[in-house]
């Protein structure tokens, strides 16, 4: 028995070795291989048919699983409906019956699909493994057939022929050929038949699935219609308890856009080619001022502004005002720009919103109000200041011209490069405010203070962004020129006593190194004069006169500060426009200056009820609603209190155009809303 098993095992091993050897020879090309291309095509079709059947079986199983899931979901849905259904409601038993029948239909549909389609598909795919094994066995028998054939050919072609071995090889060859032919013939007939039967199988399978699904949907539609009728009758019995979906809340009316419109951006004005290098042109129209923040409106020392572009190319320490010292006196120096370079003074909201209350005098005369300075007076350079049309106070031009120009040269004459260089060399660097008073006056020893701009409170009104050469230049006049100026004033004019007093005070202030520090330390109860300055910004547009409007309230407040100084108590303003050095004689005031000032004061009294202040329009604004004003650039609007706090908080103001008020005197008809950031304050 053991010998038999050993013989079978050895025989199988020998077959495997022969097959391996034959395959190696065929791969190396040393032995030919029997090929049947027709059969190979049958094999490829068989593999494709098997893959398609396997996928169809997988998808059908997934479909049946989904049907089972739908059955469970439908059953749970009907159970939940039966639980919430009240006993006294119509159709309680019908709802229960519909749920039970739906579950039966789902179960029947699933079972018929399993029996009619899935089992048939499993039977169809069950024949593929056997055929696949027979194809593999035929391949092995083909190798045995080729091996026996090659062995027989080798013996027959040998020189020394052994008949016994040749006859034995012939028997093995015939045996291998017979076995191979049996497998080959069966597969040659079976594979094409299997490939052709696939069409009928697909037809029967999907016809069965579609018919079962159509029957199921038809039967379950009857149950769904029955349930729909029950729910309809239940709703008719409880019509007063109908459920309605509430929509969005109704609109109460048009809402105003809370955000105020943004003003249009204007291009920077073109520089003038004839501008003097020691002058700075003001912008044609300042940028709109945004609403102040609470931190900017409270009293106290000014908040230091954020870093900004200075008029000069190089940022120097002398160009920055030190707001954190005890005296709050700005120190300003000049950096002369290059030839044919015009620097534009940009209006920053941080400087406009600064509160200059700390610069007011400590001692104010009784019955006089503090002079208010307009924002423009804090931002424009001194060389753009012009004389007020109300009253003209003569001034000495020598205090401005002695420092940088000869006596026979006007201030506005074009300077040469040589004069510019001399100016830079002649300008000393002033120390910071925290240095002792003796060191602060050392670079300017022997220089006197001028009439127009040497008052410490006027220096506070000069913006840090403007050229400060004017404050240094005013120290060039001597005490003798101040005495000559006092003598030149007319004796019969009401301004003479006041002017003389101002000159005496200027001379006394010049004798001390730090005028304001000495005043604060001594605590002398002497009265200070804060002249009101009217400024006319330069315009880059031809034919356009963009002039600062001086309001009546500002005129009255400014003149009340000056009135106690003179014997006649006249209202007057100091002229800050410099005059040439050779015109030392005083210029008398115009005949109608006092009348113009008085008429402005009378017009200020005829203002709308609740008048707050005036604003000037910087940009055109077209009204979008009937309660808004249509404004053009340059219009003056009289601001009155707003009826709605929401509009005021959103940046809207209420007012009436000054032209409409002067013409109609009807506030209720002509007032309207307008954006605050399109305007600037005039008072």
Swiss-Prot record:
Keyword field: Coiled coil, Cytoplasm, Cytoplasmic vesicle, Cytoskeleton, Membrane, Phosphoprotein, SH3 domain, Synapse
Residues annotated with Phosphoserine modification: 252, 262, 268, 272, 276, 496, 626
PROSITE patterns: BAR, SH3
Membrane keyword on record: yes
Amino acid composition bias (Pro residues), ranges on this chain: 261-274
Membrane topology: Peripheral membrane protein
Protein name: Amphiphysin
Protein species of origin: Rattus norvegicus (Rat)
Species classification: Eukaryota, Metazoa, Chordata, Craniata, Vertebrata
């Amino acid at each position: 028995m053991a010998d038999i098993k050993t013989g079978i095992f050895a025989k199988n091993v020998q077959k495997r070795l022969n097959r391996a050897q034959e395959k190696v020879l065929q791969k190396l090309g040393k032995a030919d291989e029997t090929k049947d291309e027709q059969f190979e095509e049958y094999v490829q079709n068989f593999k494709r048919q098997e893959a398609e059947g396997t996928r169809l079986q997988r998808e059908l199983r997934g479909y049946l699983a989904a049907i089972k899931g739908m059955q469970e979901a439908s059953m749970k849905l009907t159970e939940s409906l039966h639980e919430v259904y009240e006993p006294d409601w119509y159709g309680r038993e019908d709802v229960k019956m519909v749920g039970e029948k739906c579950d039966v239909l789902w179960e029947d549909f699933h079972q018929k699909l399993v029996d009619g389609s899935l089992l048939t598909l499993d039977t169809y795919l069950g024949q593929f493994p056997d055929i696949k094994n027979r194809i593999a066995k035929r391949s092995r028998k083909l190798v045995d057939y080729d091996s026996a054939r090659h062995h027989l050919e080798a013996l027959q072609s040998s020189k020394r022929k052994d008949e016994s071995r040749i006859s034995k090889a012939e028997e093995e060859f015939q045996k291998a050929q017979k076995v191979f032919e049996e497998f080959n013939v069966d597969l040659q007939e079976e594979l094409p038949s299997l490939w052709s039967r696939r069409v009928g199988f697909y037809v029967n399978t999907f016809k069965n699935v579609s018919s079962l699904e159509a029957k199921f949907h038809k039967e379950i539609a009857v149950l769904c219609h029955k349930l729909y009728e029950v729910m309809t009758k239940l709703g008719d019995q409880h019509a007063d308890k109908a459920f309605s979906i509430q929509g969005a809340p109704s609109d109460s009316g048009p809402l105003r856009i809370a955000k105020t419109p943004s003003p249009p951006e204007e291009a920077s004005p073109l520089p003038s080619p004839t501008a003097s290098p020691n002058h700075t042109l003001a912008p044609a129209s300042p940028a709109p001022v945004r609403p102040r923040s609470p931190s900017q409106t409270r009293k106290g020392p000014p908040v230091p502004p954020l870093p900004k572009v200075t008029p000069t190319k190089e940022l120097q320490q002398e160009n920055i005002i030190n707001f954190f010292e005890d005296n709050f006196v700005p120190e300003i120096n000049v950096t002369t720009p290059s030839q044919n370079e015009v620097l534009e003074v940009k209006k920053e909201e941080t400087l406009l919103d600064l509160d200059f209350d700390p610069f007011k005098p400590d001692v104010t005369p009784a019955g006089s109000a503090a002079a208010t300075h307009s924002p423009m007076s804090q931002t424009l350079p001194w060389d753009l200041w012009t004389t007020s049309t109300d009253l003209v106070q003569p001034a000495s031009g020598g205090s401005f011209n002695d420092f940088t120009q000869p006596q026979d040269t006007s201030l506005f004459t074009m300077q040469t490069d040589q004069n510019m260089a001399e100016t830079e060399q002649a300008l000393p660097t002033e120390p910071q405010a925290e240095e002792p008073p003796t060191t602060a006056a050392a670079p300017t020893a022997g220089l006197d203070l001028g009439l127009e701009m040497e008052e410490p409170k006027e220096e506070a009104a000069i913006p840090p962004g403007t050229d400060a050469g004017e404050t240094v230049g005013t120290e060039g006049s001597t005490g003798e020129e101040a005495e000559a100026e006092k003598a030149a004033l007319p004796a019969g004019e009401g301004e003479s006593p006041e002017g003389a007093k101002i000159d005496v005070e200027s001379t006394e202030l010049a004798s001390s190194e730090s005028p304001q520090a000495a005043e604060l330390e001594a605590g002398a109860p002497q009265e200070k004069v804060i002249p009101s300055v009217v400024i006319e910004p330069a315009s880059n547009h031809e034919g356009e006169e963009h002039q600062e409007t001086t309001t009546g309230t500002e005129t009255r407040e400014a003149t009340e500060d000056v009135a106690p100084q003179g014997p006649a108590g006249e209202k007057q303003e100091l002229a800050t426009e410099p005059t040439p050095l050779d015109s030392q004689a005083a210029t008398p005031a115009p005949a109608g200056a006092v009348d113009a000032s008085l008429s402005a004061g009378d017009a200020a009294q005829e203002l709308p009820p609740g008048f707050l202040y005036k604003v000037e329009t910087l940009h055109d604004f077209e009204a979008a609603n009937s309660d808004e004003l249509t404004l053009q650039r340059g219009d003056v609007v009289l601001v009155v209190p707003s009826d709605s706090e929401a509009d005021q908080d959103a940046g809207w103001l209420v007012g009436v155009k000054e032209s409409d008020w002067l013409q109609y005197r009807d506030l209720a008809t002509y007032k309207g809303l307008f954006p605050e950031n399109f305007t600037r304050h005039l008072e």
